[in-house]
Amino acid sequence: MAAYAVAGVAAFAIAFVALCSALGAFADSQQHSDSLQLSVVEHKDPFYVLLIGSDSRKGTALYTGKASDHAQLDQHADVITLVRVDPANYQLTLVTVPRDTVLPGESSKINDTLVHGDPMQTVDAVERLTGVEIDYYLMTTFTAFEDLVDALGGVAVDVPKTVKVPDPSTAENVTVTKGDNQTLDGSEALVFARARKEYVNDQDAVRQMNDRQLEQSIIRTVLGMSSESEIDQALIDLRNNTTSNMDMGKLGYLAMDFAMHESDVVLYSCTGPYSGDVNGSGLWVVNADAEAWEQLMDVVSSGGDPSGIVAEPATP
């Protein structure tokens, strides 16, 4: 395991950028992209999208090609985020699935479902954990995250503690300094999203909390876009840097409503149960809490605000 949070956490953010690009950018770009055809959507029922962040080092300066090195020839779903999209009410609900979760009757963590490179295995595991049907998935990587954040002109976040983590793209350390309302570029945002070891308690839960802050900033930035050139570039980055089974035409049609009702968009975010312990092999694991997940998903599926159902960790 790397000394810092597994790099896939950054991919969580890029995947969310991808979703938001589809929700916010299609409306303005539909007349400017020959390759994107909108499809009429008759029903506006809520649906679920799974955002998957791969921790593969391929394409980065940290890639060695050695099977003995972490996340070289295999990969893990180290960011797993379930998003409920409610087009009728202009609502997005973001639920983090802790990567160390172990489902009942299984011995491996849920992030191991991506080892063979099939995101549908991760989708299946999350469906079993949460009890909801997932319509689509989006999977992405490090460099895509950095490219999209840079294309957005950066994202503003509150940094609770100074962090220093290697940027996988360059293998060089990047420092993000504590402070409120800081605009981070792609490299800095990646570092902020990855940092875990710097926090004393509930390290991965704190990382998830930081990531949700980052993603909310990204969402608002994308939904508020007014430059056609920026939107077009974000869409190009989306298509080039993600793997997905999403019907972009249908999602684009729905996006027109979101774009026209930007001020009405409601964004909820929360974490799934993350309390865990060290197992016999010395690994941190989170045993799936079926009752807690059921309580959480009942609120999410009904369109309610799930924040606080699972208490957030203390701010570092």
Annotate each language-model stretch with its function:
Residues 1-316:
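Non-catalytic, solvent-exposed segments at the cell envelope interface
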